[in-house]
Amino acid sequence: MFAGLPSLTHEQQQKAVERIQELMSQGMSSGQAIALVAEELRANHSGERIVARFEDEDE
């Protein structure tokens, strides 16, 4: 479970995807790009935050 994740609008999510794609087109790995954008979002986000729970369902 992750607490304090930014709650993003669809437009904000789309901009994040575009930023990740831009970084990857410049040679950054997908993992690095995602981590960087996530860090930027957390640092700059001033809106609501959510609690998210991720579970692996390999069964």
From Swiss-Prot:
InterPro entries registered for this protein in UniProt: UPF0181
Top-level lineage group: Bacteria
Record-linked Pfam families: UPF0181
Family designation: Belongs to the UPF0181 family.
HAMAP family: UPF0181
Name of this chain's protein: UPF0181 protein YoaH
Organism encoding this protein: Escherichia coli O127:H6 (strain E2348/69 / EPEC)
